[in-house]
Amino acid sequence: MELLSASRGFLKCNFHCHTTCSDGRLSPKDVMAAYRALDYDALAITDHREVTRPAADEIPAGLMRIPGTELDFLLPTQAVHLLGLGVSPDIADCWNPNGTPQQAIDSIRACGGRAVLAHPAWSLNTTELMCSFRGLSGVEIFNSVSSVPTNALRGDSAAMLDPVFANGQLLNCFANDDSHRYEGECGMSATMLNTNDRSVAGILRAIDEGRFYATQGPEIRELSLTDGVVHIACSPAKYIIFYSNEVWIPNRTRALEGQTSADYVVSPRESFVRVQVVAEDGKSAWTSPIKLG
């Protein structure tokens, strides 16, 4: 089963950022220009509780704008922030800020959007809460602004997501900047969509089909599952690491400087496998969890 293939091409995307229409420091026009200058192909402006709609002549050539918003809740011991990607402007009227996060997920979907759980490590989200959600299209495995130098080291949510995956909630993984200040976090990460369809419909279709990976820079070029073997091809890596619901599996970390591929034989006890590629500079790329069995 082919999961990712370089033959389909990749689009470099950021699905989480803010402008002066909410709590960002740059105008929508300047934000879009900044991301296009960094070779991003698609951008979702996700201002809080509204859908920002820049004028057509403000959108740089070569950049596809995906409608978006961010809905937020503060619970007694954690926050919940939800991205609505591809959502219609009606979301501002059809969600209830005094309701529940699940109701917000339902509202995003009712308005044609895809709901993505943002920065769960930063938000202190529990396994129980994340497993309770229904209708999510994914989760941020990495969020740039939740890490240094703009925040504490809560940008990487990978370790806390494995218990969620192990309990059957297999969520596709995004990496987004969540840019606010534009003081270094812009361009720190990307979600790489495995499609050459640059339309809004094509981008949302790739999200629906899970054809993407999350990255701080390293490339994943091929990913497949065939006869119980996970195969990955990537840019030169220091480590290629295979994670699953099993706490002890031999040979799950491949440490060979400059390696560009690895194979992993799954065991009958494993319900999912995900892969992390770590480059020599310490930056990572992550696949989504692959369902087994």
Language-model-derived ranges and their functions:
Residues 1-10, 30, 167-172, 177-293:
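C-terminal functional module detector
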Residues 2-118, 124-135, 140-163, 174-176, ...:
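A metal-dependent hydrolase metal-coordination microenvironment
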